[in-house]
Every structure is written in C-alpha cells, then in structure tokens.
Amino acid sequence: MSKSADLFAKAQKIIPGGVNSPVRAFAGVGGSPLFIERADGAYIFDADGKAYIDYVGSWGPMILGHNHVAVRDAVIKAAQQGLSFGAPTEMEITMAELVSKLVPSMEQIRMVSSGTEATMSAIRLARGFTNRDKIIKFEGCYHGHADCLLVKAGSGALTLGQPNSPGVPADFAKHTLTCTYNDLETVREAFAAHPEQIACIIVEPVAGNMNCIPPVPGFLEGLRTICDDFGALLILDEVMTGFRVSEGGAQGYYNIKPDLTTLGKIIGGGMPVGAFGGRKDIMQYIAPTGPVYQAGTLSGNPVAMAAGHACLSVLTEEGNEKRLANTTKILANGFKSLADKYNIPLAINQVGGMFGFFFTEQKTVTSYADVTKCDIERFKRFFNLMLKSGVYLAPSAYEACFTSLAHGDKEIEATLNAAERAFATLAKEANA
C-alpha cells in the first residue's frame, strides 16, 4: 500500500470522507487521492516522494507555479510582523488599488476570506441594492456552497452527482432561477416570468466548474443588455477566471463591464482570500456606509494581502500574460493532435491559462448538456494512465485544468509524451 493510500484510510476515520473538500477524494476517477507533501514550480510531490507535473495548481491559485520565491518571501516578511490584527492595514489599501487598476469595473473593493464568501456577499448586496429577492444562475456553474447557490451546481457537486444539496430549504431555493449557460432565450424567459423580482444574474464568464466552457459570441453582451433592460445587476464570478484568462480577467478579455465582480484564488497567491467589488454607488450600500451587513474576522488578513500583492506584481510583468496563454494553447493543441492521431474522439476548450478536454464525438462543447454526454469512463481511464506517468490532471471530468508560468517546454513535452502513450492505450483497448 502506498503512503497516500495509508493516509487516506487514516483520514477517513477522523475527517468525513477523508478530505476537507469533496472533489479531492478522487470519487470522479477512482482510487485513493494523492496526499501531497510539498510542491515546487510546476511539480507536486506526494507522500511517497513521487513527482507529478501539476495541472491542478491548487484549483487555480498557483499561476506563478508552486512555492514562488516572491510570494514565499512576502509571506515570511508579513508573518514576522504578526499574523492577524483585526484592524485595517496599509497593505489592504495597496492591494485594493492594484486590483482596481487591473479590473477598472471594481471601483471599490471589499476583501473577504474565500470565493464562497465573495459570491454570497455580492448576491446579498445585489438584493439589498435592488430590493429584489430572486437571482439567476446557470446550470452547471458553481459559485461556492452558499445555500442559494447549491441549485443545479457544478464543480464537486456535479462530480458527486448531487447538484442539488440536501439541507437547502425550499424557501431558499425558490428564489434561485436556473437558466442554460450560453442560451440567452432561457434568460429572457426568466425575466418575462419575473420582470421586477430578479436582483441579479451571477455567471462564470468562462464556466470552469463543468470543465471549461467559454461563452459563445454575444452571450455575455446579451446578459449585460438584459440586466440593463430590467434593472438587474450583472455579477461576474471571476474567482477562477480573474487574472488567469487575462490581466483584466474575463471581463477584460471579452470587453464586458459588470456591476459587481467576485474574485478569489489567484489574488491570495495560495493563501485563503476572496474579494468582491464594483460600482461605487453599489459598494457604498454595504456596511458601514450602507444598510447591507457584511463582516469577517480575518477579512483583509495581512499575510494573505502580502501574498496576493506579490503574486499579482509578478504575474503582470510584461510578457507573462502572453507566455501563459501560448503555453496553454500549445498544450491543448498537442492533446487534440494526439487524440486525432489515435482516432480518439476529443474536444478541447482553452482560454488564457485554463483548458479542458472532453471525450466526445461532438466538435464543440458549449453547454452543461454537452458536458453530461461526454464519455466519463474514458476520462477516468485517461486520468489514471496520465497519473501513472507522472502527470496530475484535475481528478474530475467536470473540472478545468490550469497551467502556470512555471510550466516550460520540458514539462509540456513530458506531458504530451505521456498523453501519446495514454491515447495509444485507449485506442488499443477500443480495438480489443
């Protein structure tokens, strides 16, 4: 038995399911999850000392690569001054100014401690500002585990086949309207049925929790127009896409101006952090300047702020955005070429530093319905073949994968060599 398997057995005795977040349990791919001992650059190292080229990146935050010296040094320096004060610090201002500079729609910003907290708070603010109760989300999109958002959700909820969670009262769920991602007609129908009751639309501008689904042309623009027509707010959930799709997030990439934006992952450089922000008149509606209450003991944590500022400072150095996108494109195209070589039906989506692949006969994958038609068993087999070759992909067919600035030619070549062996095995098994 590997040390990871031994630790997993031990963990299940004291931690529900043996993990502190469901998708880590490998339920979507089988076997025991890797228990990680350390990480550096493009690599993670499991409890048995085996190295893996990592395309999970702590589910997105590690865009510079693991254990980057600038982030590590910033964390050490900040920690030496104290871990938490429960009072304002100058670094909170510095960090907020940097984020606002990169994402101009965020005229004012409130720091929180997680992406879930950011989306939950943004929705509360939207409801308070508009004096409306209902919200629109999209099937297969995941915005954290707040009660009102666990309705036809993606990510780990989708992996486990439980997109609607027990424990969410019907009275909460009834205010959440679910539409079809990349289908504006379903949104128009929702507003036609509830014209003055919908506070906001919340959407992942690139859906990363049902794998990787970019918006079709006109979709985000259509959402903006519909919100304007009906007096609702548009919230872009950029917890995953923020600074990964482009320096200005998906909203910069697609030239869409939301009313509110939520961030997480990358802005903490690996530390727990989230943020929400937007139009000043809306943000002024939150306490202490307005009536909508939101608070957090560790919000704006000085160590997390230092880590995030260091991460964004390096990330936005000239040439890094283009290099990350090019690396990801080369990798995605390589996967597709190899799949074609071995007659394995595969569709690939890629935007900036995120990508996803789908074992399907379909040429394009643009919706939750498309994703659910993919060959999950073939994905499981491919994942485990790649893992055996030292390549760690997202352990679920419903999760996006991520590259980092630490992924170079060596890592891409090794990954594609492993992929060729895996596709060859899949082809052989299909013809057996």
Swiss-Prot record:
Pfam families registered for this protein in UniProt: Aminotran_3
Annotated GO MF terms: glutamate-1-semialdehyde 2,1-aminomutase activity; pyridoxal phosphate binding; transaminase activity
Gene3D superfamilies reported for this sequence: Aspartate Aminotransferase, domain 1, Type I PLP-dependent aspartate aminotransferase-like (Major domain)
Coiled-coil portions: none
UniProt KW keywords: Cytoplasm, Isomerase, Porphyrin biosynthesis, Pyridoxal phosphate
Residues found modified as N6-(pyridoxal phosphate)lysine: 265
Protein's recorded name: Glutamate-1-semialdehyde 2,1-aminomutase
Lineage summary: Bacteria, Pseudomonadati, Pseudomonadota, Gammaproteobacteria, Vibrionales
Gene that encodes it: hemL
